[in-house]
Design a protein with these regions (language model features):
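Short histidine-centered catalytic/ligand-binding loop motif
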Residues: 86-90
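Conserved TIR/SEFIR loop-to-helix hotspot centered on a Trp-containing motif
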Residues: 78
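Short acidic/glycine-enriched loop/turn segments that link adjacent beta-strands
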Residues: 81-83
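Basic, often amphipathic N-terminal segments
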Residues: 1-72, 92-152, 165-174
Length: 174
């Protein structure tokens, strides 16, 4: 989401329970945090541009979300990609199933454009800078782990000129 253009959209899982442990680090090191995106796991980005998004598309997301049980996640480990420090959501199976359902419905849209594998590794970004320079951040976050969360909805975010905004929320099956 770092090179996003106005009108870009994404489908994300919000994880507010991790904010006390990582919020200050995200504000400092995650380029999307200051733009209004809270702690999250990305399901699909980029998705249909806002100007082409239809009610039928949103109905499709609502259908997928409505068939999805709430997802119980535990964040107990920190992972690293080149230039990314992240929390590992476990179990990842329900997230991967959600990614599969969304990409099956919209096969022209792969997570991250297919750049990081299909499907990519589910993760919650803490910092998008060289992780090897973040020893103090890692030590601080490790003290707060594990963190548990129940995710009960999928959120549609849209890139505006001033940052990201929430367009809709699609509740999971209750």
């Amino acid at each position: 989401m770092t090179s996003a253009q106005v009108g870009d959209t994404g489908l994300i899982l919000l994880v507010p329970e991790v904010e006390p442990a990582i919020g200050r680090w995200r504000e400092q090191y995650d380029s999307v945090a200051p733009l209004g995106v809270p702690a999250h796991v990305t399901v699909l980005y980029p998705w249909i541009p806002a100007g082409r998004l239809t009610e039928a598309d949103c109905d499709g997301v609502a259908e997928i979300a409505g068939a999805t049980d709430p997802i119980e996640l535990t964040f107990a480990a920190i992972g690293r990609f080149p230039d990314v420090l992240w929390l590992d959501p476990q179990p990842s199976g329900p997230i991967l199933a959600l990614i599969a359902a969304v990409t099956a419905r919209w096969p022209d849209y792969l997570p991250y454009g297919g750049q990081y594998g299909d499907p990519p590794v589910p993760h919650l970004t803490v910092a998008d800078t060289d992780p090897d320079q973040l020893g103090a951040v890692v030590a601080d976050i490790e003290q707060a782990l594990p963190i548990s969360s129940t995710v009960g909805e999928l959120s549609l975010v849209v890139r505006q000129a001033e940052g990201w905004s929430f367009d809709r929320r699609f509740p999971f099956r209750s």
